[in-house]
Amino acid sequence: GAWNYNALLPQYQIGSFDREKGKLTTITTRYGSAFTPTLSKDGQWLVYGSRHEDKTGLILRNLSSGEERWLAYPVQRDEQESIAPLGVLPGMSFTPDSKFLIASYGGKIWKLSVQEGTAPQEIPFRVNLELEMGPRLYFNYPIQDTSHQLATQIRDAVPSPDGKKLAFTVLNRLYVMDWPNGTPQRVSQHNFTEAMPAWSPDGNQITFISWDEKEGGNLYIAALGGKNEIRQLTTESAFYMSPAWSFNNRITFFRGPKRLFKDAESPFYSDAESDIVWMDPRGGKMQLIDKARNRGNLHFTRDTSRIFLNTPDGSLISMRWDATDEKTHVKVSGITPYGSVSEAGEETGHRRFSMGRSMLDASPLNHCMLPANTDMREPQSMPSPAEAVLMAPSGNKALVKVTNNIYVITIPPQTGKVPAISVADPASSSFPSRQLTEIGGEFPAWELNSNKVHWSLGNGHWTYDVDAAEAFEDSLQTAKKATELRKADSLRTLDAMDKAARAAVDSIAKVKAKSDTTAKTTPKEPKYEAKEIQVKVFFPKDKPNGVVLLKNGRVITMKGNEVIERGDVLIVNNRIVAVGKRGSLKVPAGAKEIDCSGKTLVPGFVDTHAHMWPFWGLHKNQVWIYAANLAYGVTTTRDPQTATTDVLTYGDMVDAGQIVGPRIYSTGPGVGYWAYNLKDLDQTRSVLKQYSKYYNTKTIKMYLVGNRQQRQWVIEAAKEQKLMPTTEGGLDFKLNMTQLFDGYPGHEHALPIFPLYKDVTKSIAEAKMTVTPTLLVSYGGPWAENYYYTTEDVYADKKLQFYTPYEELAAKSRRRVGSLGGWFIKDDHVFSKHAQGIKSLVDQGGLAGVGSHGQLQGLGYHWELWSVASGGMSNLQALQVATIHGATAIGLDKELGSLEAGKLADVLVLDANPLENIRHTNSIRYVIKDGRLYDGNSLDEIYPTPRKLNTDAWRKDGPVVNTGVKE
């Protein structure tokens, strides 16, 4: 049957199938389930596993009498609350005489007699094994103290109709440049979000949307010239998205109430209140076309009578301006990615449109953990629907984006039946198709001539000339034919020779082939390549200027086991310059001195599995998730699956000081079922080039990409491109071990079985694979977060209320039922058992990480840290896992993770000593991130630039009691 997280028992029962009558009868009814049935050779005995309280045992049934008794208890923990890919229990078997059962538990093999009162006999065994493992994959990524930084991403880049200019956004500000050799220039001096530019048909104007936390959004028009003239088109602030300018001079866009976006706590908001509207660019009244109804990618052709849109199943549709006469022109699909979780009959690939933008219709959980009721060990059967199908202005072909690649397809004439085109193999598509991208692409767009195509990736931008590509291919075919003709002539000449002459020619050819060292390799066939330009926009990095002395505090440096009971830490600008005993440092005049008497100093915490998903497509200027994590002492984060590339811009905004938050690192979208079914090493190299060259993520998430060969391609390509890959646990112990053997340096989520013995933990430790167990979403039992929700007064936490929007906090902490889980007796929780394995790993010199999984932003990190510590490791070990281990896991241990001279100034000042009680990690008085000193409660900056935190983006007042009604 299906499995699920936070499961109720029973999960399994045993059935008996009558092969003559074809009937199935359930023969067990145990609360703790019944599983792994094992029959004796003589048919007299049945042994099966079951759970009693929180432990698993073996039950012996006499099949003649029906009587049962416990044969062995406790034994190996069962895997009934997981996918159990190796079986719910290890296999067992009766001896040929049916008198003994051979089973394994407790790390040993046992011989169990069916006679009651007989003690189990250990069967001694020893295995001497030399285990071949891939070399350790580790890179160090320096953080440069430069004054400026190159923007990582350009977004929504669109060419002018004639292709001579390019409009795009960087850090949510609108730029225009002459294409391809111009210098990017700001269009306005606005200090709010500018997004989604669209050109007028004559190329002289640009329309774009805005967002401001106080004012809301509007639509603007910029007339480009010597001095750009900018005017606001809309008269009512609202939530606007995805404008498009038609050839009959109408600006069409999506509109929703301002509240819809202002109140959104995550990327997922309802499309129910959004409309498709149009306005005259000269002003006037907004005209309603239709409700959005899960449609998007608004665009136009030269046929001004119709509006073109997409639906989530990959269809290109059109309708008239009054929303009548809707037609479907084509339905497009791509490859079948490995391990997709689409359900039977579901054709949208878990995508939907919100305010005209294609969005993943899922939560962070579903895109980082194996979804309940699914098994991703086999490829799915449904191809990916196109995310965008954009009709060319000429109306005879379309630009397609599917699984992060871009194609051009021919649109067949309408004959009544909707044509379905697969671009999985363009050479065999039902209508002419062409793949344009080699390494992926985003934001596809046409030029007016319907011949040139544009797309972006990171800060790279490409143009592809379809006619030039066809001409290039035609020239290759002509050259091939000429070569074949020459070969044919040579063969005819050879046939005319006598036997001796042919033998001489053959001998010469063999000698030449032997001496030609290049004969063993087949040169790649030349092909047309898109033209690439790196769009360079530099922004000033946020870097403080000042000196801070943290004096007379307990300093837990994480430099080995060093603890300075009364120590000082000196910070100049954004670096620690000295750490020592009280009064031993040379302090510059004018330093800001913070008396830390009675307090404890630790490095800023590193969250190695932090899902912080802000708003996609349109970006806010302050992000509550970022503020919450920083206020709770998390100064560095790594999101190991972001689903989209929006994080690249958000990370730049933090680096620029536009958003207050921790350091934002990520793997970008996971490499795996997100988009791929890898064919070979070369394709894998191309896929990873997105991350190494264009996203600059430094780490990647190898997310169940497929079989072991495919996984080995990923780690080989990652090593070549200096990327550190982490892996998805997937509730599959065998998978986890092969990933370890292949040299992967990271593992996300707990290993699904426990206890773990030293053969496993020592191997992981020696391989230096960092295990981030994410115990708040434990495998194999109730999630640890449910322990805290039932033992803590979460909703009443004032600090949490300050940083968490009401809807988010109330939904998580007032009631917990269904998939969130509920109440579980303490003994049934498994997080401490998993934590024992982490302790064994750390005791043997291994690496672990603290990953909050985005379950409860801010405080959730401490819950995870306390859970990791619950397996018996010392408090100092737990703090090391939270700091220097985490920094090592993401290649930043030379810059972060300890309090040492030369490292970046990420420091927490705690009111209480976490060495005495690990829960004192949540006694934060001050947070210092990159040399800036913040109040640990309000996150107001104290030094060097005193200023209050802007909370307009998420703080709102509740209702005022004004009725006099008493309950």
Q: Which residue ranges define each predicted feature?
A:
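Divalent metal-dependent hydrolysis catalytic cores, especially in the metallo-beta-lactamase
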Residues: I625-T645, G661-G672, Y694-V705, I715, ...
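Metal-associated gating/positioning segment near the N- to mid-region
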Residues: K599-Q658, Y676-D682, L735-P745
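Acidic, glycine-enriched loop/beta-strand segments at the rims
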Residues: V537-F539, V555-D568, K581-G583, L859, ...
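A flexible loop/linker signature enriched in serine peptidases of the S9 family
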Residues: G1-G15, L24-F35, Q44-E67, P74-L86, ...
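Histidine-rich, glycine-flanked metal-binding segment
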Residues: N561-V602
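Active-site neighborhoods of metal-dependent hydrolases
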Residues: W674, S686-G706, A750-G871, L876, ...
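Residue-level detector of Asp-centered blade-edge/turn motifs that repeat once per structural unit
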Residues: K41-D42, P96-D97, P161-D162, P201-D202, ...
